[in-house]
């Protein structure tokens, strides 16, 4: 089964904060597509939190677009708990006028033959700031799983700040045996 969810965060009448939490559960053989368009106005902050658990053959396809003038703080946590689960995350942004975009994306591979693909592309101008922390964690038991993270950023000016912190974690087994000495 498949489901598509669309969120639009539009400018409010006054400055302030908006906090949104989206929790998803992709059951066996299901696919969830989450599309989020973030268009906050100047002086408006968006705190966005997405969490998803994917069972066997479960998938999350995430598309996030950041436009507008407000600051965005984005947290994404996905657990690929069963075999053949997957995450495809695509993030696009146009940041300007000292706008801030702070992303912390974590995907944990538990099942076998799981897959994660993370693509973040955008443009920074007018003293805008972006920090992207992307972590792909291969937990013990996630044999034959794969993950990829790519990013393309267009920097329009010497006053922009672009920080990217990619992390890949991989559980390691250490074997010791007297038989190895034979």
Predicted ranges, named:
Residues 1-2, 6-174:
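Conserved beta-strand/loop scaffold segments within soluble protein domains that form the structured core
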Residues 178-182:
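A short, hydrophobic C-terminal helix/tail in secreted or cell-surface proteins
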């Amino acid at each position: 089964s498949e489901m598509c969810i669309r969120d639009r965060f539009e400018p409010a009448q006054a400055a302030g904060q908006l906090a949104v939490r989206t929790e998803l559960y992709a059951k066996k053989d299901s696919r969830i597509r989450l599309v989020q368009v973030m268009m906050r106005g100047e002086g408006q902050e968006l705190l966005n939190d997405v969490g998803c658990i994917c069972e066997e053959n479960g998938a999350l396809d995430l598309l996030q677009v950041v436009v507008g003038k407000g600051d965005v703080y984005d947290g994404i946590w996905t657990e690929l708990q069963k075999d053949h689960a997957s995450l495809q995350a695509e993030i696009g942004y146009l940041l300007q006028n000292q706008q801030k975009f702070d992303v912390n994306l974590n995907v944990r591979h538990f099942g076998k033959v799981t897959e994660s693909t993370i693509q973040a592309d955008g443009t920074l101008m007018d003293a805008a700031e972006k920090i992207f922390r992307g972590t792909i964690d291969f937990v013990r038991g996630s044999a034959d799983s794969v993950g990829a993270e790519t990013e393309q950023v267009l920097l329009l000016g010497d006053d922009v700040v672009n920080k990217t912190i990619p992390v890949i974690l991989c559980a390691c087994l250490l074997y010791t045996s007297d038989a190895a000495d034979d």
